Amino acid sequence: MYIDGVFSGGGVKGIALAGAYEVLEEKGFRFKRVAGTSAGAIIAAFIASGYTSKEIHALIEEVDGEKLLDQRYSFLPLKMLQWVSIYWRLGLYKGDTIEKWIADLLRAKGIRVFGDLQKGSLRLIASDLTNGTMIVLPDDLARYGLNPDMFPVARAVRMSCSIPYFFEPIKLKTDTGTATVVDGGVLSNFPIWLFSKERKRPVIGVTLAPRERERPKKNIRNAFELFGALFETMKDAHDARHIASRYEQNIIFLPVDDVMATDFHLTQQKKLALIELGKRRTELFLKQWTY
């Protein structure tokens, strides 16, 4: 059965998305169109490029997450280097290594630019801080004077997963100036709304967040907790409105509480546990899902 799929962001927690994909594929579901933000952008790009769930599972087992972080070398002490990197480079890590890793894997399937994919089969979300707008890739690239068909898919994925202060933002250079682009999760971490205006088949979403009614209330007692709650609300409120009103029955919820989004040092055991969580939750979802 053909479906469309939407995958949420969540950093390293996104390994659980691979488990969900594995069960969906085993049950005979095939994706015509996929969309995603951040970690969801990575798995969406792999699916659109023809990777099977088993192949993605193998990639997760093989990759050393620590090696995807391009370290900076300096005479400065580590702590000082980190502050300098954030202040001047706007990110602890350049992000070049993870982009190359993605590009190499896509190239192995014959995919380099969006024109190599079936038109409309992949959409990714990024955030343009310079102009204060959300970017839907590749659709909105024309706004920047860029040819969507000739834009590298790996660069678009890198834009979508540029976690603020962790990876350097992407500087999108155009004829009209330079836009600073960061993680799509800043504006829409779970773009389940993307296919609503042109729904052609069932849409299944997979999110790394809990159901709205299961979310813990935020305790705000100081400025740091206020900032955290403010950022979380900005990130999730837009998507939560869509989920609550229309889509919840079509969403697989994979709440991951014991892993940080930026923990690239996961053991094999923890990776497999995340995949198993995705599989288990998806099997439960399919037992009661009707379409």
UniProtKB/Swiss-Prot annotation:
Which Pfam families does UniProt cross-reference here? Answer: Patatin (PF01734)
Residues forming the motif GXSXG are 36-40
> Where in this chain does the record put each PNPLA domain?
5-196
Q: Where are the transmembrane segments?
A: 34-50
EC class: hydrolase
Its topology with respect to the membrane? Answer: Single-pass membrane protein
The active site lies at 38, 183
Which processes are annotated in GO (biological process)? lipid catabolic process
**Mind telling me which CDD domains this protein's record contains?**
Pat_ExoU_VipD_like
Read off the SUPFAM superfamilies from this record. FabD/lysophospholipase-like
Q: Which GO-annotated molecular functions does the record name?
A: hydrolase activity
Motif GXGXXG: residue span?
Answer: 9-14
- Domain of life where this protein originates: Bacteria
Localisation per UniProt entry: Cell membrane
Cite the entry's keywords alphabetically.
Cell membrane, Hydrolase, Lipid degradation, Lipid metabolism, Membrane, Transmembrane, Transmembrane helix
Q: Where would you say this protein principally sits, based on its record?
A: membrane
Q: What does this protein do?
A: Probable lipid hydrolase.
Tell me the protein's name: Uncharacterized protein YqhO
Taxonomic path: Bacteria, Bacillati, Bacillota, Bacilli, Bacillales
